[in-house]
Curated annotation (Swiss-Prot):
Compartments, as annotated in UniProt: Cytoplasm
Lyase keyword on record: no
HTH lysR-type domain segment(s): 1-59
Protein name per the record: HTH-type transcriptional regulator MetR
Molecular function per GO: DNA-binding transcription factor activity; transcription cis-regulatory region binding
GO terms of biological process kind: methionine biosynthetic process
Gene encoding the protein: metR
CDD domains in the record: PBP2_MetR
Family to which the UniProt record says this protein belongs: Belongs to the LysR transcriptional regulatory family.
C-alpha cells in the first residue's frame, strides 16, 4: 500500500515546507504531487497533512509515516549501494610456498589491472594452517605443493619446479662432479624456513629416507637465506627459479639432489569453486604470468579448466 515513492515524497514535503517546493526537488509538477497524496490518503483512510498550512503541518498519522521514512530510506539507500558492490569481490589468498611471493606480487598487479573491483586479502601461513582454513571457508585459494587426500578440495596445477641444493661457489660440495647424495650433507648446516620439518622437501624426500640428520638452522627470509649461503654460513635447498638471478651473478651455485627432486605447485580451492568466474580468471592470470616469466619450471596447463575464462 505504501511505496518507497510515498516515503520520499513525504520527506521532500517535510524538508521543503510546501507542495510546490517538494515538487521542484522531486522533478514533478505540483498537481502530480497533490494527486499522489490524495490517492494515498484515500487508500489509507486518513489525512497525512493539513492543507494550506504554511509551513506544512503534518497530522499525527503523517508524523508516524514521516518517522518511518527517516528510518527506511537510509536503509534502502545503503542496500542499493551494497547491491552495486556485488562485483567487488574479495579473494582471500594464502601461500605455503615462502619464495612464491617473488613472482606472485607482479602477477597480482597484472590481475588487478584487469579486475580492479576484485580485492586480494593476503594471509600468511606462519599464523595458521591454510588448507584446513580453506576447507572451513576462511580462505578462497591456497598456493601449495601439498595435496591432502579426501579433503574435498580441488587442486589446479600451476607449474612443476625442481628443488636444488644451494651453496657458496667456494663450498667443497660445489666442486663435486656427481649429483649430491644424502650422506654428503651429514655434517652440514642446513638453513631452512621456520616450518615443521615434514613440510621441507629436502627432508621428506631426500634426507629422512636415508636416515641423515644435518644441523638445522632457521632463517625466515629468502633473501637473507641466500646471502647467508653466499657467505658460507651454511647451505640450503630452494626451487631453482628462486636463485636464478643470484646464480647468474656468481653469488651461489646449485646442485641436483640425487636424481632430482621435482615438485608441483597447485592452487587449492574448494571443490565446486572451479566454476566461479573470478576464481578461474585469477588462477589463469597467475599461471599465465609465471609460465611466461619464470625459468627452470615445467608448464602444467590444463586447458579444459579455462573454458569460458575471460580473455585477460
Amino acid at each position: 500500500m505504501i511505496e518507497i515513492k510515498h516515503l520520499r515524497t513525504l520527506q521532500a514535503l517535510k524538508n521543503n515546507g510546501s507542495l510546490s517546493a517538494a515538487a521542484i526537488q522531486l522533478h514533478q509538477t505540483q498537481s502530480a504531487i497533490s494527486h499522489q497524496f490524495n490517492e494515498l490518503e484515500k487508500k489509507l483512510g486518513f489525512k497525512l497533512f493539513i492543507r494550506k498550512s504554511n509551513p506544512i503541518k503534518f497530522t499525527a498519522q503523517g508524523e508516524i509515516l514521516l518517522q518511518l521514512s527517516k528510518e527506511i530510506l537510509p536503509k534502502i539507500h545503503k542496500a542499493i549501494q551494497n547491491c552495486k558492490k556485488t562485483h567487488q569481490m574479495i579473494i582471500k589468498l594464502a601461500i605455503e610456498c615462502h619464495s612464491c611471493i617473488q613472482w606472485l606480487t607482479p602477477a597480482l598487479k597484472i590481475f588487478q589491472k584487469k579486475w580492479p573491483r576484485v580485492e586480494i586479502d593476503f594471509y600468511s601461513d606462519m599464523i595458521f594452517s591454510p588448507q584446513p582454513s580453506l576447507q572451513q571457508g576462511k580462505l578462497d585459494i591456497v598456493l601449495t605443493s601439498e595435496v591432502l587426500p579426501r579433503s574435498n578440495l580441488f587442486y589446479f596445477p600451476i607449474f612443476d619446479f625442481e628443488v636444488r641444493l644451494v651453496l657458496s661457489p667456494n663450498h667443497p660440495l660445489a666442486q663435486k662432479k656427481h649429483n649430491i647424495l644424502p650422506e654428503d650433507l651429514i655434517s652440514e648446516i642446513l638453513m631452512i624456513y621456520p616450518v615443521k620439518r615434514d613440510k621441507l622437501d629436502i627432508w621428506k624426500f631426500f634426507l629422512q629416507p636415508a636416515g641423515i640428520i644435518p644441523i638445522f638452522k632457521n632463517v625466515n627470509n629468502t633473501l637473507l637465506l641466500i646471502q647467508m649461503v653466499a657467505a658460507k654460513m651454511g647451505i640450503t635447498a630452494l626451487p631453482h627459479w628462486v636463485v636464478d638471478t643470484f646464480e647468474k651473478q656468481g653469488l651461489v651455485v646449485t646442485k641436483k639432489l640425487g636424481d632430482g627432486i621435482w615438485k608441483r605447485l597447485y592452487a587449492a580451492i574448494r571443490d565446486g569453486d572451479q566454476k566461479e568466474l573470478i576464481i578461474k580468471n585469477f588462477i589463469y592470470a597467475i599461471r599465465l604470468h609465471v609460465c611466461t616469466h619464470l625459468k627452470f619450471i615445467r608448464d602444467t596447463q590444463k586447458p579444459h579448466f579455462f573454458k569460458n575464462v575471460k580473455n585477460i
